Every structure is written in C-alpha cells, then in structure tokens.
Regions:
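The canonical Cys-X-X-Cys-His
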Residues: 382, 404, 723, 727-739, ...
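Beta-propeller domains with acidic blade repeats across secreted/periplasmic ectodomains
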Residues: 24-436, 690, 738-741, 817-819, ...
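C-terminal structured "cap/appendage" subdomains that terminate the fold
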Residues: 379-383, 388, 397, 609-615, ...
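Long, ordered, helix-rich scaffold segments
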Residues: 396, 409-726, 745, 752-754, ...
Length: 867
C-alpha cells in the first residue's frame, strides 16, 4: 500500500506542467486572461490585452517608446508646468505634455531635453530647479546628484551643475530624489554599490560593523565580495548640495521611496535571488524608514535576519522580485482606499502592488494587493498626475521595449479626495521625541533610558540609538550596573558596539580596544538571569555576547567556561530564532555539547533552511564529536546536495562542507576517508518528495465537506510543533514561503488567515486547480520553429525572455528571443498535485491547518492547552 501510494503521488506530480505548490486566492486580485494570444513580435509596448488591473480600474497604453531613438525609460517626474519628464536608462531626458483624457500621446510632442545629462535614475522638481540622480553604468559622466536650471530666463533648462559626484556601479547605484516633508531639503536613495559619501551628520551611529561571530561565507558567485556596511544609504541633503546627513542604512537595492501624509518615509528593498532557500534569504520588502534605522544588509551569508535586535523588521515582506518605482496614491481620482495606498513596482514579475498601510504601535503593518499585473510588464516607475488624477506607469529598463500607460478609475465608488486623519498616537509621539536625541544631547540618557525595554520595537530602537549617540563615559557605568536585566542587555549591546571596533572596519590608526571594558561587559552579561528575560530579550542577550566577542576579542578560557554554563542549559530552545543564535554562539565557544545537540536539531528540522543554519554553525566545531556523530554530520551533505535554491545555493553547501573538512584533525580525516571521498547521488524533486513521505501509508481520500466539518470543531488544543512538522512532511516548505522559511516557487502562505477561513483554506488544498494564483500559473512558450517550454517568465533583457522551467529549481532557465515567439499560453492545471492530505491522519491535518492559520505564531490561541 505504501509503495502504491507513493507511486500515485509521483504520477500526480509528474502530470503537472512542473512541480510547484498550492495557489492562494485574493478576492480583489486582477485576473489574468485565460488566453494570452500571440506573442509580441513587433517593436511595440505590451498590449492592453496582456495587462489586467484591479476591478473598476482601466489601463490604457498611451505611448510605445521607439527604442532606437528614445531608449528604454526607467524614471518619471513632473516639471513646474505639469509636463512629464522621462529618462532613458542609457540616454537623456524626454519631456512631453499630459495626454488628453482617453487619448494617446502624440509622438511629435515627445521632445528630448537639450541638456547635457544622461542615465538619470531620479527626477525631482524643487527649489525652482530640476534635480536629477545619475547612475551611469557606462561611466560617460559621473554618477551623483545634479541640478539643472534656466540660466537665461527663456523657459528652457540649460545649466547643469554637479552638486555631488558619487562612486557607484551597476544597478545598485544612485537612485531616487524625494522632497522632504518640510519642503526644505531633499532625500537621496542609494543602492548598496554606492560608496558612502561624506556627510556632516548621521542619525545612524557611526559604529559601522559586520558583527559576524563565525566567519562569513561570501556569495558563491562572487557577488559583492568585500562590500562592507554601511550600504544602501538614505541621505538628506540641503538644496545647494553642501550639507549631508545619513538618515538610514542597511538596504540592498532600494530604487525609490515615498512619504506619507504624516511625513513617514517608506521604501521597497530588493532581495538577493542567489540566496533563495537559504536561512539568510530575505524577500523583497517594504520598510519604514525611521531616524537612525538600519535594515541589516551585509554581503554573502552576513545578512541580518529580522529577529536580530540590531536590525529592524520589514513593514511587510512581499516575495521574490525586482523593486523599482514607489509612490503614494495621493491626488489620484481613485476610491479612498487606493488614494491612501503605497504603490510599489516589481520589474521582474510585472506587477504594481497596492500596499495598504495600517498604523500599529509607533510603526505600521500592511497588506498587499496585486493592483496591476502583466506579462511581459517590466514596470519601472509610476506617478500620480495632479491635473487629471490618473496614474502614469512606465515600462522599460535594460534596453527592453518601453511604454507609457495611464491608469484611471471607472467604477462606481466615490473618488472624492480622502480626508487625512493624522496619526497622533502616543507611541508615535514617543518615538519621534526620542528621535530628536539622535545626536549628542545632554538630556538624551535621562530621556531614553527608561524606554530601553519598551514593548514597541521601534520605540526601543529609537531609545537605544539615542543612547549610542552619547559619549560612552556618560553611560557605560550605568549600563554595566543596570538592575533591570532587560534594560541591561539592551544597554550592553549598545556598549559593545560603541566601545569596540569591528575587525573588518578596524584601521591601522585606531587605538587598541579596551579589553578591560570587554571583561566588564562579559561579567555583567553573566549576571543576567535568563529566566527573567522575555524571548526578545534573550535574543538580545545572546547577540550582545556575540557583538562583544567580535568587536573586542574572544574571551579568556575561564570566562568561556562561564559563558557556556550560562547559555548551554537553554539550548536547544523552543524557537528556531533562539536556536540559531545559541547554536552559533556555543559553536564559537567550542561547547562540548553543541555538536550532539546541533545534530539532533538537524535531524528534526522540517526545513532545509533550518538544517542548513545549524550545519553552518557546526562547521568549525572541534569538540564533542564521536566518529559516528561526525559521520552523521557529513552524511547530511548527501541530502543537502539535492536541496534546491538560488544560483549560489550549491556553492554555499560546498563552502560549509569545505570548512567542516578543514576543521578535522588529520586522524579524523583518515577515519572518515570513505565518507569524505563519497560523491552525492543526484535525485529528482519527485524522488526527494517520495523519500520525505516514506514510512507513511495511505489513510483515505479526504473530501472537502468531511474535512470542513471536522475542522469546524477541532481547531483547539492543537500542536504547533506537529503542525510545523506536517508542513514539511507533505512538501509545503519545498515551494511555499512561510514565516520567513521555505521555497519561493509558490505563494507565500504566511498571511493565509487574512485571506481564508478554514473551509476556504481546505478547498485550496483539496482542489488546487479550482483557482490558481496568477503569479504561479505556468506559461507554455511556443516559438515560430515549434520549440516548446513551460514555466514562469522571470527575466527580460533587451529582446531576451527568460523562463524558469523547473519550479523546484530556480536555476533551471531557458531564454528565448521574443521576436521568435509564436505564442504564450497559460495552463489551467495547478502545479500543485491533488491528494497531498491523503497520507495524513485527522489530527495531523488539523495541526497542519492550525499552523498555517496561525501565521507561524506558536502562542496563537489554537495551540493553548486545556488547564
């Protein structure tokens, strides 16, 4: 029976266009057409038949950009007369009047601006001038910030001034310019390949550091090796370009941003697609840019996960993509909900998202909605025109066919301008009060210290940042002797950063670090009672140890033993986050028990990310191994060789193994020679899934109505641990992102409880083809000469269309010349097979449902036990 069931499951998977996972629906999501029709062969922008908008909205193609003459447009802006300005990524600026309602743009009205400027990524009219941010790949002019003015008074811009040259390279360079809310200054957004420029002030404390306890592994393909923080910086500059201040840092590649009506800045940051399915992968995400914030980008494996106390969490994680333009809907003749939305553009997936922000504490949470989708639809920028209230969207970039589209509302809801309700919550006021101390100030310690244990993370960040800006002599003693252990760990984390020097940033001219201070910090941390700390404070305690070790040095032997005694009893913990930091720290300290405990975690971890993280930490451990335990560790690499991930995934696995082999003694290398010489057997995704299901027998063919009835009364006293285990057992983690773990080839299921009730979620699982998430609908590509491929369009470059043909493996791609395409047709069959629940028992299904609907929160009421 078991073998037969697995064969049935494999057959079901093989029958799908390619392996992927369950579709999640959204009531307001625009629907893709059932038939896409002929491919684009002529040199015209994507036709409207390939583009769909949210209900009630209309999209019009107003202009197909002649690429040979006007290039490929990446940025839009307005001048003081309301004329639209567009920039060619590798050329100049073009200006034209607003097209008449319902009419296309007359090509004769598109004029190249007669100014010596090119490669503009940011456009802003302010202070009677046109400011532009230049990011010139070809280095024909300096990248940086320029001001263009009318020197003769004839109404034509003719004078170009370079306000600041900046060193930048590739896509991740100098980007958007935004008028500050007070209309007295300008914010500049830069990517992580822009070298930091001189600044008189910084809201972010200038204690730059990588802060890796274990040796960082660089990207396996060499991307950004050697690039250190700070990176991805947002600056504020004066109109004359002379005064500069760092506002925030730690972004990968933010292209644009927008201020809401309360003056809060939001941006949309890029993921690192090479990191797919690794523990350090971070999806594209919307971030709230607060004073002194740091969002944790570092190269290679060094990216800080959201749970680290020395970074901040995203407002909302979006998923894989390529962020471009950002704008709020203010001034649009849209319903109020859409006037207040933050619009973010995803170039690679061809989407405009409407992000609906909701104040929470001193920051925000959000939900996302697919507002416009198209294929191909490489969106680059969007603006709201104040004269007609329409949204104008450009496509282009990387020399692909460019176009300009108009989006209007034609539905029945009111488009009366939405009334602004200022966010005057006490927590916002408190955060902003603390942010005023993000510079030296005699009152800062007194004002900030009480809030180091505030329950609101952004308030806590603002308080700690205020402390870090003050001379450490004013507060080091207070930190070391603080009686409140929650405040102590926050203060000592700050003291470790400000009192030590990160070795990657240490200069020859730097004075030696104060080892006496390091001993005091360690001794103070040793006195902290673990059991009196909340989970977040426990994470801060461990991280404070890590930063202290990194910025000062490894503690002496006697202190190492004391620290191990302090932390080891709490490992393993109840959460992946705590286990991540505990395993890493105890491995660094060469705890005698970490090898055994870490291997138990690897065996029981349901995701490849979690397994990979523990394996990464154990690679340098030399103590506590038996020969059999060593074998068990190296046998894991045979399993890992068949895991799928981004372009650097296999290299990361190789790096971990190489380090582990190098950590072996000569004697151990001889003992383990057979397993070290053994080569992994490559297996298909179907074989891997069959192995995961091995040992399970067919239970029954579960029906929707039956399961719905059981779930109606069975969602209490569930098991979080078993639910997570089942999520891995039936292959969900292989395709789905969930609570910052899992694959990227199916919809992110973290927010399922906001989209589904229990019955609807079961319906999606039992009947996966009933409604397929458009983002993951496989497309069949047919060329003029009859060649076929099935997959998802993942990249465009010039006339090249790239398709991912194996959704279990992001690296399986095939490229086509778009001029050679005959058709693109969507499949009506979900990549997710039916019957995945048929090998689970009733209680296992209920635990699985509870896990999904809990958004991965172990303290959800569904997991509360009867007293």
């Amino acid at each position: 029976m078991k073998k037969t069931t697995l064969l049935i499951l494999i057959a079901a998977l093989a029958a799908t266009p390619f392996s992927a996972s369950a579709a999640a629906k959204k009531k307001s999501r625009p629907r893709r057409p059932q038939t896409v029709g002929p491919a684009i062969n002529e040199n015209k922008a994507t036709p409207i038949s390939r583009i769909k908008a949210a209900p009630g909205f209309k999209v019009e193609l107003v202009y197909s950009v002649p690429g040979s003459n006007q290039g490929s447009w990446v940025n839009l802006g307005l001048d003081d007369k309301g004329r639209i300005i567009a920039s060619d990524q590798f050329g100049g600026l073009y200006r034209f009047p607003l097209p008449a309602p319902g009419k296309k743009l007359d090509p004769k009205l598109v004029k190249k601006m007669p100014v010596n400027i090119r490669a503009v990524n940011g456009i802003l009219w302010a202070f009677d001038a046109l400011y532009v941010a230049v990011n010139d790949y070809e280095r024909k002019i300096d990248s940086g910030v320029y001001r263009i003015t009318d020197s003769t008074g004839d109404g034509e811009l003719d004078k170009v001034e370079k306000l600041r040259a900046m060193q930048a390279s590739g896509d991740h360079g100098v980007h958007a310019l935004l008028l500050s809310p007070d209309k007295k200054s300008i914010h500049l957004i830069t990517g992580n390949n822009t070298e930091p420029t001189a600044s008189q002030k910084s809201r972010v404390p200038r204690a730059w550091g990588e802060d890796h306890l274990l040796t960082r592994m660089p990207d396996g393909r060499g991307h950004n090796r050697g690039r250190l923080g700070p990176a991805g910086i947002i600056y504020k500059m004066s109109p004359d370009g002379k005064q500069w201040e760092i506002i925030s840092s730690g972004y990968r590649n933010i292209f644009d941003g927008g201020f809401n009506r309360d003056g809060e800045l939001f941006t949309y940051d890029a993921d690192m697609e090479y990191d797919f399915n690794t523990p350090w992968y971070r999806p594209t995400r919307v971030n709230h840019v607060t004073s002194g914030s740091m969002y944790g980008w570092r190269n290679g494996t060094g990216k800080r996960p959201e749970f680290y106390p020395d970074t901040l969490p995203a407002t909302i994680n979006i998923g894989p993509g390529s962020p471009t333009g950002v704008t709020f809907g203010y001034g649009a003749k849209f319903p109020a909900k859409y006037q207040n939305a933050l619009y973010i553009l995803d170039w690679s997936w061809g989407k405009v998202y409407a992000v609906h922000l909701k104040p929470e504490g001193s920051s925000y949470t959000a939900t996302k909605e697919e507002f416009i989708i198209g294929s191909p639809f490489p969106v680059t920028d969007a603006i709201i025109h104040p004269k007609d209230g329409a949204m104008y969207v450009s496509i282009g970039g990387r020399r692909v066919q460019s176009g300009l589209y108009r989006v209007t509302y034609t539905g029945k809801e009111s488009t009366t301008p939405a009334k602004h309700q200022p966010n005057r919550s006490k927590l916002v006021s408190l955060r902003k009060k603390l942010e005023k101390f993000h510079s030296p100030n005699a009152q800062a310690i007194k004002q900030a210290w009480p809030h180091l244990t505030h329950s609101d993370r952004f308030v806590r960040w603002a308080a700690r940042t205020a402390v870090m800006h003050q001379p450490i002599k004013q507060w080091s003693g207070k930190a070391l002797k603080e009686k409140d252990h929650g405040k102590r760990v926050e203060a000592l984390l700050a003291l470790s950063k400000m009192g030590g020097i990160d070795p990657s940033h240490r200069k020859d001219s730097d004075a030696p670090v104060d080892t006496g201070l390091a001993r005091k910090i360690v001794n103070s941390l040793l006195q902290v009672d673990w059991n009196k700390l909340q989970t977040e404070q426990q994470l801060t305690l461990i991280r404070a140890y890590q930063i202290c070790f990194n910025r000062f040095d490894r503690p002496g032997r006697s202190n190492v033993e004391k620290i191990v005694q302090h932390l080891d009893p709490h490992f393993p913990a109840q959460t992946f986050e705590l286990n991540w930091l505990l395993c890493e720290t105890l491995a660094y300290l060469q705890s005698p028990s970490v090898a055994y405990k870490g291997m138990q975690l690897i065996k029981n971890a349901p995701t490849q990310e979690e397994q990979m993280e523990y394996a990464r930490s154990l690679r340098f451990v030399k103590q506590g191994w038996s020969t059999s335990l060593r074998r068990e560790y190296f046998e894991w690499f045979f399993k890992a060789a068949n895991y799928r991930g981004g372009a650097s995934f296999s290299k990361f696995i190789e790096f971990i193994r190489n380090d582990a082999v190098a950590s072996l003694s000569r004697t151990d290398q001889v003992k383990l020679k057979d397993i070290l010489d053994k080569k992994p057997v490559r297996k298909s995704p179907l074989e891997m899934l069959a192995e995961a299901m091995a040992g399970r027998s067919y239970i029954k063919e579960w029906k929707l109505d039956e399961l719905s009835k059981i779930a109606a009364t069975g969602m209490k006293n569930r098991s979080y641990a078993n639910g997570r285990k089942m999520f891995g057992a039936v292959g969900c983690f292989a395709c789905h992102r969930f609570a910052n773990e899992g694959g990227m080839t199916g919809p992110d299921l973290t927010g399922s409880s906001g989209r589904y009730n229990t019955h609807d979620l079961l319906d999606q699982i039992v009947n996966p083809s009933k409604e397929i998430n458009e983002q993951f609908v496989p497309i069949e590509v047919i060329t003029l000469d009859g060649r076929k491929a099935t997959g998802i369009v993942v990249n465009l470059n010039g006339d090249s269309v790239t398709v991912n043909t194996d959704m279990f493996d992001p690296n399986q791609r095939e490229s086509f010349d778009r001029k050679s395409l005959k058709s693109l047709e969507p499949s009506k069959v979900s990549p997710m097979p039916e019957g995945l629940l048929n090998m689970l028992k009733k209680e296992e299904i209920l635990d699985l449902l509870a896990y999904v609907l809990s958004a991965g929160e172990a303290n959800n009421a569904m997991f509360a036990k009867k007293k």
